[in-house]
């Protein structure tokens, strides 16, 4: 069979975590790669770019669950990746488990941004940020 993979961010995982039960019920061998920066990434990025790094209610290091343990509590397999050189081998291992749902929790630095980013509502291409400190 074909494996399905999804990339996600941790906050959305908390809103839909109960679906791990549905996946077990139907035997869905999905691979979930969770990009975990322990923050509301786009909110924090906006606070960096528009408000000079004045953060408010955008980081959650102390209050997050252990997603690997949570995944395993639902009967699936989970891996935590905290070092870049472990990512490739961990993904290979995850995708080799053809008959299991596997959750890979990948920690990234909170200062990492996603580009390009359109910062003006209904804006044009000229309103886009191409890199940190670099507008179109």
Predicted regions located by residue number:
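Conserved beta-strand scaffold positions in the cores of enzyme catalytic domains, especially
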Residues: 32, 78-80, 103
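Short acidic, glycine/serine/threonine-rich loops at helix termini
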Residues: 17-20, 42-47, 114-119
